């Protein structure tokens, strides 16, 4: 009986060790913005709870209560299942108590009404640059450029920098090559100018000979 118990215990232990452990959710890139869309940050999160923590740290919200909605349509993000079903680089909007999601068009209309009271200041174009990292190991990261014309038409473009270290290395190499080429050109130009000045000085007559010609010409006139 004792031998049977020992064997069954070893089998159970082996089965428990052979079971694969649940994989942790991978880090996903996303971005967060404020209700007025004036601030936009890029972060990496594993879950919805992790997103709340990093939003609080990134936007320095301390203990202020907030909730998250999708920036494109205002859908509330409340469950982990719905969060995991979203695509990468999704933009979340942070709303506080009393704030409501508004589409960009309504915000542009309010912006134009506010400008109507101040006709002396009209923004023709506004360009914002948002530099963020999708991977913490990236050297430069990603650049989001957003241009707004007359507060109505907006265009945004995401530039994902791949191989940033290689790009920087090539840029430094070309900068070094340009500086060397410029140095050689300046050195060659200075040598040419020096030779030109020396040749000009050789063609001019000496001052002593020019002075001696004056008394000779006077004697001939006498």
From Swiss-Prot:
Name its GO BP terms in alphabetical order: execution phase of apoptosis; lipid droplet fusion; lipid droplet organization; lipid storage; negative regulation of lipid catabolic process; negative regulation of triglyceride metabolic process; regulation of apoptotic process
Quaternary data: Homodimer. Homooligomer; undergoes liquid-liquid phase separation (LLPS) via its N-terminus, facilitating lipid droplet fusion, occurs at the lipid droplet contact sites. Interacts with CIDEA. Interacts with PLIN1. Interacts with NFAT5; this interaction is direct and retains NFAT5 in the cytoplasm. Interacts with CEBPB. Interacts with isoform CLSTN3beta of CLSTN3; inhibiting the lipid transferase activity of CIDEC.
Q: Where is the composition biased (Polar residues)?
A: 1-19
A Pfam match is CIDE-N
Tell me which GO cellular component terms the UniProt record holds.
cytosol; endoplasmic reticulum; lipid droplet; nucleus
Question: Can you tell me where the transmembrane regions are?
Answer: none
Q: Which organism is it from?
A: Bos taurus
Q: What is its main location?
A: other
Kindly list the places in or outside the cell where this protein is found, as annotated in its UniProt entry. Answer: Lipid droplet; Endoplasmic reticulum; Nucleus
State the name under which the record lists this protein.
Lipid transferase CIDEC
The protein's matches in SMART domains, at most eight in alphabetical order, are given as: CAD
Cite the PANTHER family for this sequence.
CELL DEATH ACTIVATOR CIDE, LIPID TRANSFERASE CIDEC
Entry keywords, A to Z: Activator, Apoptosis, Endoplasmic reticulum, Lipid droplet, Lipid transport, Nucleus, Transcription, Transcription regulation, Transport, Ubl conjugation
The record describes the protein's role as: Lipid transferase specifically expressed in white adipose tissue, which promotes unilocular lipid droplet formation by mediating lipid droplet fusion. Lipid droplet fusion promotes their enlargement, restricting lipolysis and favoring lipid storage. Localizes on the lipid droplet surface, at focal contact sites between lipid droplets, and mediates atypical lipid droplet fusion by undergoing liquid-liquid phase separation (LLPS) and promoting directional net neutral lipid transfer from the smaller to larger lipid droplets.
Matching PROSITE patterns: CIDE_N (PS51135)
């Amino acid at each position: 009986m004792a031998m049977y118990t020992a064997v069954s215990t070893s089998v159970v232990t082996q089965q428990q060790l052979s079971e694969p452990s649940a994989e942790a959710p991978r880090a996903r890139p996303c971005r967060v913005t404020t209700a007025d869309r004036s601030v936009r940050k890029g972060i990496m999160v594993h879950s919805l709870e992790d997103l709340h923590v990093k939003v609080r740290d990134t936007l320095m919200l301390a203990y202020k209560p907030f909730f998250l909605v999708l920036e494109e349509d205002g859908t509330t993000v409340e469950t982990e299942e719905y969060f995991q079903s979203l695509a990468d680089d999704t933009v979340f909007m942070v709303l506080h108590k009393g704030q409501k999601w508004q589409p960009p068009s309504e915000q542009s209309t309010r912006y134009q009404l506010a400008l109507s009271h101040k006709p002396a200041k009209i923004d023709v174009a506004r360009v914002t640059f948002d530099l963020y990292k999708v991977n913490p190991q990236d050297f430069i990261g990603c650049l989001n450029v957003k241009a707004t014309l007359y507060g109505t038409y907006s265009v945004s473009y995401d530039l994902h920098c791949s191989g940033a270290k290689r790009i920087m290395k090539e840029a430094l190499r070309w900068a070094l090559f340009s500086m060397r080429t410029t140095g050689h050109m300046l050195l060659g130009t200075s040598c040419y100018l020096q030779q030109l000045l020396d040749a000009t000085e050789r063609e001019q007559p000496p001052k002593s000979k020019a002075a001696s010609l004056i008394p000779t010409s006077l004697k001939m006139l006498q």
